[in-house]
Design a protein with these regions (language model features):
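Mixed-charge (Asp/Glu-Lys/Arg
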Residues: 2-314
Length: 314
């Protein structure tokens, strides 16, 4: 895991994405050795250090057989590598995470004519508060640069990314999260008011929405369980017991019953009211899953069943 040496807020003038080698061949070495590395092999390292960009561009113009646009793009990328400040930020992507760093100004030419800059501190895959920067939690307008065919490029939404790395809340996201929490709390109250049969029906719908297939009619054919369900995607069969109100003793009794059946891979005990401490049960019984009121309410929201619940309680 690569962590920053100083968890200080960033305020870069520029942020650049850098592809670390063709096909990512230098990604692992750069991250572990704390460097950024540029290919673009040429005899013009000293010209680049001196800022003689006309000479550099002429080399790449010849290399590109007179293609002005390609030579300009090449030169601009090389120039960024040499000239970005120590306060500017470099990003790359590896194993579905965003990594960022700042680099020392000195550019060092290696024997193969590739060049490196040493990272200040170390590469980081977290924001300054230690939260992982996973690709699935980053705006696609930032992560799309993974498909860039060149080596170095600017990014869209630089202000957004600075906030992301600095661990700052995005106002519209925080507002929506607060609304979602309020909705979930309201759903909890509606769930608590359900008739026991309607509560069972709601849980049946949750399993169905998640892709589980029911083997028998709800609560009709088996005395020991309310739902006998199978997941085609995981190929697991589950024993499901549903109670509006329950006790610790009752849950443990049903766990003993579940263990008497060989055909089930896991058990779900679903309830909305229980006064006892149940925090140790899932640890003691790894294949047993307890769904309390908060968990059920969250699943109702995620499964799109809030309107069904409202209509049932109306």
């Amino acid at each position: 895991m690569f962590l920053p040496s100083k968890l200080m807020p960033i305020a870069p003038e520029k942020i650049r994405f850098i592809k670390l080698g063709e096909g990512g061949e230098w990604e692992q070495s750069c991250l572990s050795e704390n460097t950024i590395r540029l290919g673009y092999d040429s005899p013009h390292h000293q010209d680049s250090l001196n800022g003689n960009w006309n000479a550099v561009r002429q080399f790449w113009l010849n290399f590109r057989n007179g293609n002005e646009g390609a030579a300009t793009r090449d030169t601009n990328q090389i120039r960024d590598f040499y000239e970005l400040k120590e306060t500017d930020v470099w990003i790359t992507f590896y194993k579905k995470k965003l990594y960022w760093c700042r680099a020392a100004c000195d550019v060092i030419e290696l024997d193969d004519q590739s060049r490196i800059r040493n990272v200040i501190g170390s590469w980081s895959s977290t924001d300054i508060n230690g939260k992982a920067l996973r690709i699935e939690n980053i705006d696609g307008r930032v992560t799309k640069v993974q498909g860039y065919r060149g080596t170095i490029c600017s990014i869209d939404l630089q202000d957004y990314l600075v906030k992301k790395i600095n661990g700052l809340a995005i106002s519209e996201v925080e507002k929506t999260k607060a609304s979602l929490e309020m909705l979930t709390a309201d759903v909890e109250e509606l769930v608590k008011g359900l008739w026991w049969h309607d509560f069972e029906l709601l849980i049946d719908l949750i399993f169905s929405k998640a892709g589980w297939q029911r083997f028998s009619v709800l609560g009709k054919t088996e005395k020991d369980l309310d739902l006998d369900v199978y997941s085609p995607s995981t190929q697991k069969r589950a024993f499901v017991q549903i109670k509006s109100t329950t006790t610790r003793a009752e849950i443990l009794s049903y766990i003993e019953t579940y263990q008497e059946y060989e055909q089930f891979n896991e058990m779900y005990f679903v309830y909305h009211t229980c006064q006892a401490d149940l925090s140790d049960i899932e640890t003691r019984y790894p294949n047993v899953h307890l769904w309390g009121l908060k968990r059920v309410a969250g699943l109702v929201v995620n499964a799109g069943l809030a309107e069904w619940l409202i209509n049932k309680r109306t």
